């Protein structure tokens, strides 16, 4: 159900405040699996290092620690490069993505990837809020305490992100990302 007036304003302020909960620099490591549409489960490890939302690096590695791919985000464009183990993992490479001012570290920390402004709000039957501003659609938990999932629309693709089992506003322990037919399941390593 679409919401207007004070509830819509409250929903927008709630989602707009979530990126501020992520304190930079961000450093985190993950273990997980990638499942292509037609293929075997591929285990991997990953790490993110971000000095700021405009200076981020995400590395994907095989289970032996050999680099498969790197994503470098300058706050406007995500460059994707192959690592030495790319061929062994079946990664052929990808063109750069003009994603705009997105933050990969915020997404992996359980916050919206883009700043929130001027959006349409709605409420699900369970009480969760939904907010869409063109580039992203965000969904809260029913108690409206944290981000439960999101969909991002970047040129040439849609990226869906879910945080299954999330119970607090702390960085999520588990993240499921789907992009271009590949589902990545990440588990945040203990710090």
Feature map (PLM): residue ranges:
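Hydrophobic lipid-interacting interfaces of membrane-associated proteins
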Residues: 31-37, 63-66, 81-85, 136, ...
């Amino acid at each position: 159900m679409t919401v207007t007036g004070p509830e819509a304003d409250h929903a927008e302020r709630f989602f707009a405040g979530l990126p501020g909960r992520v304190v930079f620099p961000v450093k985190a490591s993950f273990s997980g699996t990638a499942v292509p549409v037609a293929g075997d489960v591929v285990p991997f490890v990953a790490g993110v290092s971000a000095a700021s939302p405009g200076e981020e690096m995400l590395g994907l590695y095989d289970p032996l620690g050999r680099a498969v791919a790197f994503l470098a985000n300058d706050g406007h464009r995500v460059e994707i490069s192959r690592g030495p183990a790319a061929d062994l993992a079946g990664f052929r490479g990808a063109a750069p993505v003009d994603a705009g001012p997105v933050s990969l570290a915020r997404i992996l920390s359980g916050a919206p990837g883009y700043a929130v402004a001027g959006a349409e709000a709605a409420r699900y039957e369970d009480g969760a809020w939904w907010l869409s501003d063109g580039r992203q659609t965000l969904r809260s938990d029913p108690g409206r305490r944290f981000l439960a999932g999101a969909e991002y629309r970047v040129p040439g693709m849609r990226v869906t992100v879910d945080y299954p089992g999330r119970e607090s506003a702390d960085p999520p322990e588990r993240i499921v990302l789907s992009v271009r037919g590949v589902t990545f399941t990440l588990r945040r390593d203990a710090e």
